């Protein structure tokens, strides 16, 4: 049987997210859903596209709950095919061992994952995470501050996500219904 990928999207305070799921699990989450984005995702995955709403029902439901402020752990299966062994080790540790509302430093994640690499290498793994939000790279921070973020519109998205999870205090203009204003 030929492997396939199905696409679905979720409206969130951060915009319309695209989710790609194979028979194995969620393989990719991107920060926008557009025809070009889907084509690039399909090319990257190298799989034919099918229409399979049932495959996407649980991942989309869990993403909507997440953006509703529900402090749950994602329980959807993950398809790690777009990661190398180091990424899989580090991102797998992050997925299973850094829950809602907690943060960990880049160096701390390197230690916890027993990856044997420095904080800078962990930062590179976070920047290449094909499944942001579900594999919560926004929870990884610098030892001297919030650190960087390559998802969405950048650092303001990371700050918004950490505030939603209670890891950062809310500012007077913070809103669960409205994401950060793009810079």
Predicted regions and their residues:
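Basic nucleic-acid-binding alpha-helical/helix-turn surface characteristic of O6-alkylguanine DNA
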Residues: 1-116, 165-183
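Short glycine/serine-rich loop segments
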Residues: 117-160
